[in-house]
Curated annotation (Swiss-Prot):
Organism of this sequence: Saccharomyces cerevisiae (strain ATCC 204508 / S288c)
Stretches the record annotates as Disordered: 1-89
Places the protein is found: Nucleus; Cytoplasm
Regions of compositional bias (Low complexity) in chain numbering: 34-44, 63-83
InterPro entries per UniProt: MOB_kinase_act_fam (IPR005301), MOB_kinase_act_sf (IPR036703)
Entry annotated with the keyword Lyase: no
Function according to Swiss-Prot or TrEMBL: Functions as an activator subunit for the CBK1 protein kinase. Part of the regulation of ACE2 activity and cellular morphogenesis (RAM) signaling network. Required for coordinating polarized cell growth during interphase with the onset of mitosis. Required for mother/daughter cell separation after cytokinesis. Also has a role in the prevention of nuclear export of ACE2 from the daughter cell nucleus after mitotic exit. It coordinates ACE2-dependent transcription with mitotic exit network activation.
Post-translational modification Phosphoserine, affected residues: 59
Biological processes, Gene Ontology terms: budding cell apical bud growth; cell division; establishment or maintenance of cell polarity; septum digestion after cytokinesis; signal transduction
Family, as annotated: Belongs to the MOB1/phocein family.
Phosphothreonine carried by residues: 76
Quaternary structure note: Interacts with protein kinase CBK1 to form the RAM CBK1-MOB2 kinase complex.
UniProt protein name: CBK1 kinase activator protein MOB2
Keyword Zinc in record: no
Length: 287
């Protein structure tokens, strides 16, 4: 379900590594939603399946502030004063500045695109969109992956007041370099979407009871990667003239999350000023 066909992008690490950021580089891919990237995460994306019809009772429970799972993370708490400070500081951030904050590939909102189509099973619709979001985000991360080095980004964060900690196998919170965190998150998501017990592809197999919970966790991890890229690598996105593609992709992602109430608003705090701007512009509309 790739709704956009537009200019190619990509990176050839051997070619781009030695070129300065102010040198325009030719695109390397036909579409940004059709080809896997060659990032350091080394994920192998599964082939797209046409899932059979099935009936599910998918619903998303209210979000809780408790840790999400052994494989996922928790954030450092933010006080209202810190959040207000971040909002003030964020006014100077590139992705909130003109003209970038208004740049988009798609005019109007994604409301009709994210709504559940008639006669389509909710679980099928959720699964399809989650897989597409993951595939596209995986590609976008490939554009900036070579710049996400442990020396440059020793912690995974989304701005000055939001740090993301990984919960290891012993349920201990550990601070990781952004590159390691993102690779672990993408690998974890990749394993989830390729788990046929969680994302069944055979006719007649229902979605499991934990499907909604795992979808919430997958979407939260993807949001955190969005947040890191916006706060630290938006200049690379602009350098490649991909800000319209990126903003539209994020608007699509958030519209879907809001339509089905998948991500809690508190989790969106690092990008809330941007989301609110998109809402005012009519790019994000929800009930």
């Amino acid at each position: 379900m790739s709704f956009f066909n537009f200019k190619a992008f990509g990176r050839n690490s051997k070619k781009n590594k030695n070129q300065p950021l102010n040198v325009a580089q030719p695109p390397a891919m036909n579409t940004i939603y059709s080809s896997p990237h060659s990032s350091n995460s080394r994920l192998s994306l599964r082939n797209k399946h046409h899932s059979p019809k099935r009936h599910s009772q998918t619903s998303f429970p209210a979000q809780k502030s408790t840790p999400q799972s052994q494989q996922l993370t928790s954030t450092t708490p933010q006080s209202q004063q810190q959040e207000a400070s971040e909002r003030s500081e964020s006014q100077q951030i590139m992705f909130l500045s003109e003209p970038f904050v208004r740049t988009a590939l798609v005019k109007g909102s994604f409301k009709t695109i994210v709504q559940l189509p008639k006669y389509v099973d909710l679980g099928e619709w959720i699964a399809l969109n989650v897989f597409e979001f993951f595939t596209n985000l995986n590609q976008f991360y490939g554009v900036v992956a070579e710049y996400v080095t442990p020396d440059a980004y020793p912690t995974m964060n989304a701005g000055p007041h939001t740090d993301y900690l990984w919960l290891d196998a012993n349920n201990r919170q550990v601070s990781l370099p952004a590159s390691q965190y993102i690779d672990l998150a993408l690998t974890w998501i990749n394993n989830k979407v390729n788990d046929k017990n969680l994302f069944p592809t055979k006719n007649g197999l229902p979605f499991p009871q934990q499907f909604s919970r795992d979808v919430q966790r997958i979407m939260v991890q993807m949001f955190r990667i969005f947040a890191h890229i916006y706060h630290h690598h938006f200049d690379k996105i602009v350098h490649l003239s991909l800000e319209a593609h990126w903003n539209s992709f994020f608007s699509h992602f958030i519209s879907f999350a809001k339509e089905f109430k998948i991500i809690d608003r508190k989790e969106m705090a690092p990008l809330l000023p941007l989301i609110e701007s998109f809402e005012k512009q009519g790019k994000i509309i929800y009930n």
